[in-house]
């Protein structure tokens, strides 16, 4: 009985500070990666530059990610999760689509990829059988319903390649959400 009482006095999560540090480090690495894509370009960016810009040691970077591709995958996961979060916080489906559209159209990393590395961008956008795309598709289906989500995702992919302005984002989001039956 005494042993179980001592367990109750232990902190709920003794690893919370380590987890928080891990998350901050990951955020710094992913933010640095996105900045480097925007300034240096995807192909020219190196793991050494990612470590330097994120202000972590190379060993720390490699403890988190084994290579540039794994950093890029984590960045894609993070960005799609961010877009889903934007959609979930929006007051309605039209606003959600509009906000996601503006984020995609104004993203500096996507802008740089369109100019410097369109082939990699096209490959990434066409890999819609990937688990990341499936998760994004499911989240969009919860927001819009399955038929509208298919249209909305294709519309958003188009903006990664051919961005639109904020006014177009609003009017086109209204058109998509206004469709009764496809």
Residue map of PLM features:
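Amphipathic alpha-helical packing segments from all-alpha helical-bundle domains
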Residues: 119-154
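Residue-level detection of the helix-turn-helix DNA-binding "recognition helix"
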Residues: 52, 66-67, 77
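Hydrophobic alpha-helical connector segments
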Residues: 70, 74, 81-108
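Short hydrophobic/aromatic patch on the recognition helix
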Residues: 54-65
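Amphipathic C-terminal alpha-helical segment
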Residues: 106, 110, 146-169, 178-182
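Amphipathic alpha-helical segments used for helix-helix packing
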Residues: 101-127
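Short amphipathic alpha-helical elements of helix-turn-helix/winged-helix folds
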Residues: 32-36, 74, 103, 155
């Amino acid at each position: 009985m005494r042993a179980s009482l001592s367990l109750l006095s232990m902190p709920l999560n003794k690893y919370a500070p380590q987890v928080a540090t891990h998350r901050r480090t990951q955020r710094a690495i992913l933010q640095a990666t996105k900045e480097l894509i925007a300034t240096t370009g995807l192909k020219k960016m190196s793991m050494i530059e990612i470590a330097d810009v994120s202000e972590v040691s190379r060993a720390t970077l490699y403890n988190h990610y084994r290579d540039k591709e794994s950093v890029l995958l984590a960045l894609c996961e993070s960005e799609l999760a961010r877009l889903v979060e934007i959609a979930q916080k929006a007051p309605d489906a039209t606003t959600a689509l509009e906000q996601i559209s503006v984020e995609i159209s104004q993203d500096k990393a996507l802008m740089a990829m369109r100019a410097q590395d369109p082939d990699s961008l096209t490959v990434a956008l066409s890999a819609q059988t990937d688990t990341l795309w499936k998760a994004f598709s499911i989240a969009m289906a919860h927001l819009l319903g399955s038929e509208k989500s298919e249209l909305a995702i294709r519309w958003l992919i188009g903006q990664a390649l051919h961005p639109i302005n904020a006014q177009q984002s609003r009017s086109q989001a209204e058109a998509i959400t206004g469709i009764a039956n496809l």
